[in-house]
Curated annotation (Swiss-Prot):
It is found in: Cytoplasm. Pathway: Nucleotide-sugar biosynthesis; UDP-N-acetyl-alpha-D-glucosamine biosynthesis; N-acetyl-alpha-D-glucosamine 1-phosphate from alpha-D-glucosamine 6-phosphate (route II): step 2/2; Nucleotide-sugar biosynthesis; UDP-N-acetyl-alpha-D-glucosamine biosynthesis; UDP-N-acetyl-alpha-D-glucosamine from N-acetyl-alpha-D-glucosamine 1-phosphate: step 1/1; Bacterial outer membrane biogenesis; LPS lipid A biosynthesis. It comes from Pectobacterium atrosepticum (strain SCRI 1043 / ATCC BAA-672) (Erwinia carotovora subsp. atroseptica). Catalyzes the last two sequential reactions in the de novo biosynthetic pathway for UDP-N-acetylglucosamine (UDP-GlcNAc). The C-terminal domain catalyzes the transfer of acetyl group from acetyl coenzyme A to glucosamine-1-phosphate (GlcN-1-P) to produce N-acetylglucosamine-1-phosphate (GlcNAc-1-P), which is converted into UDP-GlcNAc by the transfer of uridine 5-monophosphate (from uridine 5-triphosphate), a reaction catalyzed by the N-terminal domain. Pfam families: Hexapep, NTP_transf_3. It is an enzyme of class 2 (transferase). One of its GO terms (molecular function) is UDP-N-acetylglucosamine diphosphorylase activity. The gene is glmU. It catalyses: alpha-D-glucosamine 1-phosphate + acetyl-CoA = N-acetyl-alpha-D-glucosamine 1-phosphate + CoA + H(+); N-acetyl-alpha-D-glucosamine 1-phosphate + UTP + H(+) = UDP-N-acetyl-alpha-D-glucosamine + diphosphate. Acetyl-CoA binds at A380, N386, Y387, S405, A423, R440. Residues 251-456 are annotated as: N-acetyltransferase. Residues 230-250 are annotated as: Linker. The lineage of its organism: Bacteria, Pseudomonadati, Pseudomonadota, Gammaproteobacteria, Enterobacterales. This is Bifunctional protein GlmU.
Length: 456
């Protein structure tokens, strides 16, 4: 039965020694964000009023990474078991709220399963998430009498008969705050590990005549924990395949779903096609009929209808209107904006640059801190020299400007509409409308020139 309020406790104090890392285990990333952030997000989605994060190892790193002001930080100075961790959080529990216990290293738990668990919790009893395994070795076993859950016995404390049980405890449970505080106060560490087990409260509830309702998750991967990098990589692939399947069913054509990574949120139009080894990060919005070539990385971008990103291009924090073409091997850095029909070709880099309607930068150019009008042609090898060693400066180019190859525009500088800049020119002063600017050294011809001979 639901209480009107619910708080969540996330256990995240483990050292993660098997990760062989200076980073706390729960900060290792899955799909681009820390494992524990996945758990926090699931908790928030269930409508939790408070999230208590129990931490120990690497507290400063955790607080630096997890900046949500809604988190209540609870220190577990010594790691003496799950029951001990919950005892540290217990002073924050209200009597009339549900307390949901989660783990920072179980990143794929879904909000749907948590809602189901909460709805199944009996009045005065416990909702418990369990699964059945073909090989339950190492896990706490669910002990039943006449079908009812009466206790959990850890593997090291289990008898041979109990070790034959294949229903295991996932560690995720929910109980009323008042009841939970009472049970936590009665825990002891009389077991093989010398730890305080949260699982002992199951027997306490049963002894009081309270019902324990076992619920199963939709997928086994939801309750799989991470103790080493091999397990983390396995969950990463499970997660990515799930995201790929959702996109395929929603109409996105992934040419090889096994070679696609989504590390954020993707919204899309119809008939989107993505080739192999595409990585999508942050918040990305793709319009209708967008094509993404092999090996591209797209982060926090909006890409308009009928645009095409050719292979091995990297786009970050950029906005592209309809019918833009990018790459191959192009880079759009944060602040890049392309109007309809703009083209950025191979080995061209943009940073805080706006390219107007139909403008083109086809080859080997750097355009930084630039505002470029419509119908502009940027020749190969053009550079906006935006940095003077101390400060950045802006280049402004009007409409219908032709910039010849190997041009340097030394900012701050303005090139008015209709101007033409000859190849090899270094522009240091403003250019007026329809002017031709050329600063090359006059070409000389020397007949009969003898090359130097190499000395032996």
């Amino acid at each position: 039965m639901l209480n009107s309020a619910m708080s969540v406790v996330i256990l995240a104090a483990g050292k993660g020694t098997r990760m062989y890392s200076d980073l706390p285990k729960v900060l290792h990333k899955l799909a681009g964000k820390p494992m524990v952030q996945h758990v926090i997000d699931a908790a928030m989605t269930t409508g939790a009023q408070h999230v208590h994060l129990v931490y120990g190892h690497g507290g400063d790193l955790l607080k630096h990474e997890l900046t949500d002001p809604a988190l209540n930080w609870v220190l577990q100075a010594e790691q003496l078991g799950t029951g001990h961790a919950m005892q540290q959080a217990a002073p924050h529990f209200a009597d009339d709220e549900d307390i949901l216990m989660l783990y920072g290293d179980v990143p794929l738990i879904s909000s749907q399963t948590l809602v189901h668990l909460r709805e199944a919790k009996p009045q005065g009893g416990i909702g418990l998430l369990t699964v059945k395994l073909d090989d339950p070795a190492g896990y706490g076993r669910i002990v039943r009498e006449k079908g009812a859950v009466v206790g959990i016995v850890e593997h090291k404390d289990a008898s041979e008969a109990q070790r034959q049980i294949n229903e295991i405890n996932t560690g995720i449970l929910i109980a009323n705050g008042k009841d939970l505080k009472r049970w936590l106060s009665q825990l002891n560490n009389n077991n093989a590990q010398g730890e305080f087990y949260i699982t002992d409260i199951i027997a306490m509830a049963s002894a009081e005549g309270q019902r324990v309702e076992a619920v199963h998750p939709e997928r086994l991967s939801e309750v799989e924990g991470v103790n080493n990098r091999l397990q983390l990589s396995a969950l990463e692939r499970i997660y990515q395949r799930e995201q790929a399947d959702k996109l395929l069913l929603a109409g996105v054509m992934l040419l090889d779903p096994a070679r696609f990574d989504l590390r954020g949120e993707l919204t899309h139009g119809r008939d989107v096609v993505m080739d192999v080894n595409v990585v999508v990060e942050g918040n990305v919005k793709l319009g209708n009929r967008v094509k993404i070539g092999a090996g591209c990385v797209i982060k926090n971008c909006i890409i308009g209808d009928d645009s095409e990103i050719s292979p091995y291009s990297v786009l970050e924090d950029s906005v592209l209107e309809a019918q833009c073409t990018i790459g191959p091997f192009a880079r759009l850095r944060p602040g890049s904006e392309l109007a309809e029909g703009a083209h950025v070709g191979n080995f061209v880099e943009l940073k805080k640059a706006r390219l107007g309607k139909g403008s083109k930068a086809g080859h080997l150019s750097y355009l930084g801190d630039a505002d470029i009008g419509s119908g502009v042609n940027i020749g190969a090898g053009t550079i906006t020299c935006n940095y003077d060693g101390a400060n950045k400066h802006k280049t402004v180019i009007g409409d219908d400007v032709f910039v010849g190859s190997d041009t340097q525009l030394v900012a701050p500088v303005n090139v008015a509409s209709g101007a033409t800049i000859g190849a090899g020119t270094t522009v240091t002063r403003d250019v007026a409308e329809n002017e031709l600017v050329i600063s090359r050294v006059k070409q000389r011809h020397i007949s009969g020139w003898q090359r130097p001979v190499k000395k032996k």
